[in-house]
């Protein structure tokens, strides 16, 4: 499904679930944020995102896409939570030049710790359409 509105409608949740910040919304907002990012990547950026998980299926990256000769991992969080263990594991294993963390945080750009040769770009959810 490529439309965040359709996802919301198909969920059958009432608007009060969103405005009251109920437990159901806390569970649903991650899927909603991921759907929004996928919609923006495809419709606004012309990017065909893919999914990655490691062999043990314990780590996953929400989206990966190719940009020139680079594969760019994208992790999506619906809050200001900056813990992205799977993204760190992916970067440690594959050493991409750039990794993107989409969340409710402000813009930031910083090298990853632990000697990982990757620049982490924090991109606010509202700015995902600027990814390309």
Language model feature labels by segment:
Residues 1-132:
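A cross-kingdom feature that marks ATP-driven nucleic-acid transaction machinery
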């Amino acid at each position: 499904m490529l439309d965040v509105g359709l996802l919301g409608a198909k969920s059958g949740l009432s608007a009060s679930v969103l405005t009251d910040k109920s437990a159901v919304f806390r569970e649903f907002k991650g899927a909603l944020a991921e759907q929004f990012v996928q919609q923006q990547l495809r419709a606004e950026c012309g990017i065909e995102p893919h999914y990655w998980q490691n062999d043990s299926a314990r780590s996953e990256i929400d989206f990966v896409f190719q940009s020139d000769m680079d594969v760019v991992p994208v992790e999506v969080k619906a809050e200001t939570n900056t813990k992205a263990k799977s993204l760190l594991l992916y970067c440690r294993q594959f050493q991409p030049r750039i990794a993107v963390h989409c969340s409710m945080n402000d813009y930031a750009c910083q090298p990853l710790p632990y000697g990982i040769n990757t620049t982490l770009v924090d991109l606010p959810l509202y700015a995902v359409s600027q990814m390309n």
